[in-house]
Amino acid sequence: MITLKRAKFGFVEIMEYTSIGESCSVVSGGTPSRSKNEYWENGNIPWIKIGNIKSKYVNEYDELITEQGLNNSSAKLLKKGTILYTIFATLGEVGILDIEACTNQAIAGINITDSRITTDYLYYYLKSKKDYVNNIGRGVAQNNINLTTLKNFEIPLINVDKQLNIVEILEKVERMICLKEKEIDDLDLLIKA
């Protein structure tokens, strides 16, 4: 989709957009039956939950499922590099899978199929949409969005060099924030001492 966007000084800028559904494959996870011990005992496949998405790269997990649990449930094995996006309860948390793993149904797995989009760019773009997704999330007891809504999210298409530049800037900002947070924590400890 192409839209016109008013730019500075009255010039019109042409901006091209795509949707997640057009440029990515999107799947939701699943939970093997808890009543079947053979789906969980001696498992060797990492199973990711919302609480495991704590940073950009996700490689920590609390539970493992078995091959039998994977094959007899709606769980799907996601490859390293898959973007994880929470769609139930805690909406809009984003991470990039740093291992091969499965997720529960509260997490969508997004694999980019369009060479015009980089993983890091989509990660930061989705991260910037957290307030938006929390506003559109609807639920009786807990907020949620469905996969159709996620697939309809529009992504601005800019050239890959600009995407890489944006990512580089945002990564520098994140590093600076981490350093400042550590300094604040260190000062808090000093005050308490």
Model feature map: region roles:
Residues 113, 125, 176-179, 183:
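Histidine kinase transmitter module recognition
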Residues 171-174:
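A specific heptad-register position in long alpha-helical coiled-coils used by two-component signaling proteins
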Residues 1-30, 55, 152-160, 164-167, ...:
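Non-catalytic DNA-recognition/assembly elements of restriction-modification systems
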Residues 17, 21-24, 34-69:
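DNA target-recognition patches
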Residues 85-86:
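A generic structural signal for residues embedded in beta-strands
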